[in-house]
Amino acid sequence: PEEVWEQDADRMQDAGVSVVRMAEFAWSRLEPEEGVYEFGWLDRAVQVFTERGMDIVLCTPTCTPPQWMFHRYPEVIQVGRDGNKIPIGVRGHRCMSNLRYRDFCDKIISRMVGRYCDNPNVIGYQIDNELEANHCRCPECVSRFRKYIQGKYHTIDAVNRAYGNAVWSGEYSCFEEIEPPTAAVLQWQNPSLTLDYNRYASESTVDYVR
């Protein structure tokens, strides 16, 4: 609660804390409605620590998009390995490759950085939170995965040879036939396909961060 912020800050200072981090999961408070930004409360929180000479690391809230985004733009929801959109919980259920989601990320981050960039006590920004590989199977990710495979192997024959697809009659005739592993039992998937998908998912996250 805001009424104990100063008390907490004093105790942290007494304990020797010199740097704090904040706003990590606060997207719904920073943008309660699409395009409506409320940074007043964060201004006050930053001021509490600035007055005490403590440094601040601000965290982008991008790991936890607000509920209005999921309901208004369901295409930003991650698709799980069963081929269905994952149930909306409280965190981490967005597709990092979705362009609409990335646009919202750009907007909230630009607002945050533009507001606090001149505060000398704000010493840095944490990007997202505990980043994981983007294991999404939405149409955008399927398309990106196929392009990743094509860029790596160049020809479909090279894919078939590398994967040993002739063994299980799994030879592809074109890149459009390639799907990410979605079976409930991943042991039934071609391990080479699964490995390439995991590598793609990792690179997808790197691209998101950039």
Residue ranges and their predicted role:
Residues 1-4:
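Boundary/entry segment of secreted carbohydrate-active catalytic domains
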